[in-house]
C-alpha cells in the first residue's frame, strides 16, 4: 500500500469519526411529537398492568383520554407488561411517551408486592424517569388518585407534588423518591 493510500484512509477515518460524533446520526424526536408525562399511576390488574398518565401536549390524541383541555389530559392504557400499557397510551395519543419529566409515580395498593422494585427499575432504566421523582402509594387505585380535580393547579400530579413536598416535615406523612426507594430496597 502506498503512502498516499494510507493518508487517504486515515483522512477518511477522521472525517467519518467527526461525522459520527457531530452530525447526529440518531434521529431526534421533536417536542411536538412527544407526550410529556408529569404524573404516572400504576395499578396491578388480573390481566397485567393498568397505567394512567397525566400528559402535557396530547394534541394528536385520537381518543381514550379524560379531561383534555388546555393541552393536558389523563390517558390510560392496559397491557400484560408496563411496556405494553405505555405503548397503548402512545397509540392513543399518536405521540411518543416521554417520562423524563415525570416527577410523580403513584402506585396502586394492589401493586405493592415483590414486583415493585423490578417495575420501578424498568421505568428508570428504559424511560429515564428522574431519580428525584416522588413515589407515592394510593390507598386504592392510582388512576382514581390522578383523576381527582385539584384545587390550586390544573394538574393533579403537580398538586400532589406540592402537597408532598410541603408535608415532608410532618412525621405522619412518609414521602420518598426513586433514589431513596432504590437505596432502601437494595440495602435489605
Protein language model annotation of sequence segments:
Residues 1-188:
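Membrane-proximal alpha-helical signals and transmembrane carboxylates
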Amino acid at each position: 500500500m502506498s503512502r498516499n493510500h494510507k493518508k487517504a484512509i486515515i483522512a477518511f477515518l477522521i472525517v467519518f469519526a467527526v461525522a459520527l460524533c457531530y452530525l447526529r446520526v440518531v434521529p431526534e424526536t421533536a417536542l411536538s411529537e412527544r407526550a410529556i408525562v408529569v404524573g404516572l399511576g400504576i395499578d396491578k390488574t388480573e390481566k397485567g398492568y393498568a397505567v394512567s398518565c397525566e400528559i402535557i401536549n396530547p394534541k394528536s390524541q385520537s381518543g381514550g383520554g379524560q379531561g383534555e383541555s388546555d393541552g393536558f389530559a389523563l390517558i390510560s392504557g392496559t397491557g400484560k407488561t408496563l411496556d405494553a400499557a405505555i405503548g397503548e397510551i402512545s397509540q392513543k395519543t399518536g405521540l411518543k411517551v416521554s417520562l423524563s419529566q415525570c416527577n410523580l409515580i403513584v402506585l396502586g395498593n394492589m401493586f405493592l408486592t415483590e414486583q415493585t422494585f423490578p417495575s420501578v427499575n424498568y421505568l428508570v432504566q428504559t424511560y429515564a424517569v428522574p431519580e428525584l421523582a416522588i413515589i407515592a402509594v394510593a390507598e386504592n387505585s392510582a388512576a382514581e388518585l390522578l383523576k381527582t380535580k385539584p384545587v390550586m393547579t390544573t394538574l393533579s400530579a403537580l398538586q400532589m407534588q406540592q402537597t408532598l413536598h410541603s408535608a415532608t416535615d410532618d412525621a405522619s406523612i412518609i414521602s420518598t423518591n426513586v433514589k431513596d426507594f432504590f437505596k432502601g430496597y437494595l440495602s435489605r
